[in-house]
Regions:
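Conserved catalytic cores of phosphodiester-cleaving nucleases, focusing on short active-site segments
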Residues: 11-43, 56
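Residues at the starts of beta-strands that form the adenosine-phosphate
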Residues: 21, 65-67, 103
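Alpha-helix C-cap/termination motif
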Residues: 16, 59-62, 100
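Domain-level recognition of nuclease-like catalytic cores that cleave nucleotide substrates
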Residues: 73-127
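A short acidic/basic microdomain associated with nuclease active sites
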Residues: 1-6
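A general structural detector for well-ordered alpha-helical segments in enzyme core domains, enriched
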Residues: 52-55, 93
Length: 127
C-alpha cells in the first residue's frame, strides 16, 4: 500500500516489519533505450524522482531498509543505467542515495495484454 513518508511523499510499497526495521520500496517504470541493449532512466527531467531519492536517503539514514526498483518494460536490453545527460540532478541524488544505503535493482519485464511479468535482473552500469 502507498504510505506517506518524509516531507511530502508517498512510497509505492511499505513493509512494516515487527522488528522495527521497516522497508520502503519505490518503483519506477523504464521505457527509454538510446543505445544497444541499454535501458535508461529518467527519459526527461524528474524533480519528483529526485525528491524520492532524497526521501529514501533520509529513511535509510534512520535505519530503515530502502529500495529503488526500476522495471524495464523492454525485451531488447541487458543493462540499465541512470541517464545522467538527461537529468544531472537525478543522477547526483542517486549517488547520495547509494551513499546512504539505498539499494538499487533493475529488472527486465515482458509486457503483454494479460499483464507484466518480471523476467530477470539487469546489470546496473555506473556512469
Amino acid at each position: 500500500k502507498e504510505v506517506k513518508y518524509g516531507k511530502n511523499s508517498r512510497i509505492d510499497i511499505f513493509v512494516d516489519n515487527p522488528d522495527g526495521e521497516n522497508s520502503y520500496i519505490e518503483v519506477k517504470s523504464v521505457t527509454l533505450s538510446r543505445y544497444k541493449q541499454l535501458s535508461e532512466f529518467p527519459d526527461s527531467i524528474t524533480s519528483r524522482g529526485s525528491k524520492h531519492l532524497l526521501e529514501l536517503s533520509e529513511m535509510s539514514k534512520k535505519g530503515n531498509k530502502c529500495y529503488l526498483i526500476y522495471l524495464v518494460q523492454r525485451s531488447d536490453v541487458t543493462k540499465f543505467s541512470i541517464a545522467k545527460d538527461i537529468d544531472q540532478e537525478y543522477y547526483e541524488n542517486s549517488l547520495i542515495a547509494k551513499k546512504y544505503g539505498v539499494n538499487f535493482f533493475a529488472y527486465k519485464c515482458n509486457v503483454t495484454k494479460k499483464g507484466i511479468d518480471i523476467l530477470n535482473k539487469l546489470e546496473i552500469i555506473e556512469n
